[in-house]
Curated annotation (Swiss-Prot):
Keyword annotations of the record: Aminoacyl-tRNA synthetase, ATP-binding, Cytoplasm, Ligase, Metal-binding, Nucleotide-binding, Protein biosynthesis, RNA-binding, tRNA-binding, Zinc
Cellular compartment(s): Cytoplasm
Protein name per its UniProtKB record: Threonine--tRNA ligase
EC class name: ligase
Taxonomic lineage from the root: Bacteria, Pseudomonadati, Pseudomonadota, Gammaproteobacteria, Enterobacterales
Pfam family for this entry, one: HGTP_anticodon
Species of origin: Sodalis glossinidius (strain morsitans)
Amino acid sequence: MPVITLPDGSQRQFAHPVSPLDVARDIGPGLAKACIAGRVNGKLVDAVDVIEHDAQIAIITAKDEAGLEIIRHSCAHLLGHAIKQLWPQTKMAIGPVIDKGFYYDLDLDHTLTQDDLDLLEKRMHELAEKDYDVIKEKVSWQQARDAFVARGEDYKVAILDENIRRDDRPGLYHHEEYVDMCRGPHVPNMRFCHHFTLQKTSGAYWRGDSKNKMLLRIYGTAWGDKKQLNTYLQHLEEAAKRDHRKIGKQLDLYHMQEEAPGMVFWHNDGWTLFRELETFVRMKLKAYQYQEVKGPFMMDRVLWEKTGHWDNYAEHMFTTSSENREYCIKPMNCPGHVQIFNQGLKSYRDLPLRMAEFGSCHRNEPSGSLHGLMRVRGFTQDDAHIFCTEDQVRDEVNNCIKMVYDMYGTFGFEKILVKLSTRPEKRIGSNDVWGRAEQDLAAALTENGIAFEYQPGEGAFYGPKIEFTLLDCLDRAWQCGTVQLDFSLPGRLNASYVGENNERVVPVMIHRAILGSMERFIGILTEEYAGFYPTWLVPTQVVVMNITDNQSEYVAKLTEKLSAAGIRVKADLRNEKIGFKIREHTLRRVPYMLVCGDKEVEACKVAVRTRRGKDLGSIDVNEIITKLQHEIRSRNLHQLEE
């Protein structure tokens, strides 16, 4: 007679084994209808799985994130069901859940057109609307293998042979005549899978290995109700408008080309933006008392062997050779910073030592993963490393956290998710050292009033870390900042300082990044602002334009005056209609357009228009300069028009 404890602490006793669906029915018909699965003693199970002993149970519905993931996983199986009806010779590979959706890799002897994709989605909807039950069956390894051999599912057979133990009992899920293999859980009935759409296709190598066959990958998204689906699709539409690649081309910021895959060609305006961002970071480095250094962009392979990077990261490193020596182009800055620390004797009185670099790094990312500024091979890290004593860790982490929020706040990011990753099973350092380090990180977050989530076992082998993830205006997550403790690298590279008792002590090293990659952060900002960068950051802050040739001299002198005041300004003296000029510079997202006619020349004023289409009227030249200088220096996100 199992006793079931519910999330609110209440208990229900049953005279026989029950399933989560039985428990939901006992609570009420509404919950039974909404029940997708159960969480039994912390583990997700199917709605029909039998519980024979006392247990803690939560009923999973479409309102839960876990419920949405189950719906998406079942939609992947639904895709398999539909495609096998339309193209029976298809061989199914894997169909996992991904962020906000799912995909299925399959071997299809047919080039899928957009019409085919539409047909496939239509068949999926027809099947889902039948609201058939999904039947779960646990079988022996041999039974599962025999079933998939009989169906000609070579990839499922390979998964069984290579990834599943012979004494295991795989789960088979029956969608009418279609059978798929999965750990589950899945929806009990297809009425939960009505709100989905297929999105795109791509190629994907079997098991991610380019030596294997290229499979077809079909992507889709699925949600708990129509409103959620429509909201997501609207976000996708808005995201497409904000795509940094599209805006980057419109604003002539940068370009990429095949001869340098994953490397950025910065144009004048893009490089102006980059340097302004760099200036801002440099100002913050000074405020938080960092040294700025510059290390070489490549070093002998021997050094990377000492750090452990060669053993664990070699496939991501570019190499070159000269005079019988092999060099690695650096994928990160930390080994170089330890070399700088090692120059000259250091005392505990010299610590903490905060060392920052705009490091030019390169990583050999797969060509298929490259994506504009968001995923590149050559990038600049706003990287820093803090060398300190164990007693200083907490204060230094506190300082890093303050700097993170200070900088993110300038850009208007207010929703920040924070995760603390703790000790993994395989690690270096004693439990005492790890315990204190984890406590220091948690205490620093708590002292700053920051809510965070633990990620047990997700820390690196050399230390725990804090991750900062930004949520943008479309609620997309961008993991940018990290504060990572390192108990390993300083010792590997013989770093030490002289302690209070005149002994050699290995310093604790804190890896700290805030923006992460400068290139990627510019991509994030471009999409966050849709190209409407704040005035302090935008490449051209003001355009001064004449109505007729009579104002040309006035425009030229005013442009010089604005430039001397530290404002990035251009003059537009073209013989074009003023409406044409305004439209053109509005499309270029120039914050302020100063129009000069005869009246403005006579009164020593300018007519001010904004890129948002607001007319601020006629303003005295010195007054507008003062206001612009204040907006730029304060790095205010809100413009004069607002």
